[in-house]
Amino acid sequence: MEINYELYLITDRRFLKGRQLKKVVEDAILGGVTIVQVREKDVSTREFYNVAKEVKEVTDYYKVPIIINDRLDIAQAIDASGVHLGQKDMHLNIAREILGKDKIIGISVGNVKEALQAQNNGADYLGIGTIFPTGSKKDVDAIIGIDGLSKIKDSISIPSVAIGGINKTNFKDVLKTGIEGISVISAILDEDDIKLAANNLLINK
């Protein structure tokens, strides 16, 4: 499956400001988002399922891949395109056994060792970060910056997206590393005009 990782949106309902998640995701896709990850923390399984199913209606309509953060059961229940796993989540090999070879599995990495391990274990793509300080994620172990991103990117051959504090003022510097895409939350969701915010993060508008 050929995936376009150019503009990777991660959902966070804290930024909705009373707006409907489905509408926000649709506007983001219309603005240029190429892949969507549904990320829900501290909610019940049923609520996560309902949110993911709602988002999938939009991504299916626009033929955009939908990735579920962490929860393989939710990914299976809605027949998502794949999952994204952190370093402390289920081991990639087990996730692959459960989901099968046709699903996308992405792994969060913060250094060359983690990146090579994930690649060798069969990850489809990597989420590399944290690049810049960010307010969206509190448990940031280390800010790696552009230099750290470049080192990791140069060590691997699979697709990767950069994450962490990326916005319209710095995304071009990130893309100069040759990375396949950028992953954002607040740079799109915290803006009033979602479609424009997404479009402002595209290098070839």
From Swiss-Prot:
Residues given in the record as 2-[(2R,5Z)-2-carboxy-4-methylthiazol-5(2H)-ylidene]ethyl phosphate binding sites: T134, G135, S136, G165, I185, S186
Biological process according to GO: thiamine biosynthetic process; thiamine diphosphate biosynthetic process
Coiled-coil region: none
Free-text cofactor note: Binds 1 Mg(2+) ion per subunit.
Protein keywords: Magnesium, Metal-binding, Thiamine biosynthesis, Transferase
GO MF: hydroxymethylpyrimidine kinase activity; magnesium ion binding; phosphomethylpyrimidine kinase activity; thiamine-phosphate diphosphorylase activity
Domain of life, source organism: Bacteria
Record's GO cellular component terms: cytosol
Residues that bind Mg(2+): D70, D89
SUPFAM superfamilies (UniProt xref): Thiamin phosphate synthase (SSF51391)
Pfam families: TMP-TENI
Gene3D superfamilies: Aldolase class I (3.20.20.70)
HAMAP family: TMP_synthase
Stated role: Condenses 4-methyl-5-(beta-hydroxyethyl)thiazole monophosphate (THZ-P) and 2-methyl-4-amino-5-hydroxymethyl pyrimidine pyrophosphate (HMP-PP) to form thiamine monophosphate (TMP).
Family: Belongs to the thiamine-phosphate synthase family.
Record's protein name: Thiamine-phosphate synthase
High-level lineage: Bacteria, Bacillati, Bacillota, Clostridia, Eubacteriales
Gene name of the encoded protein: thiE
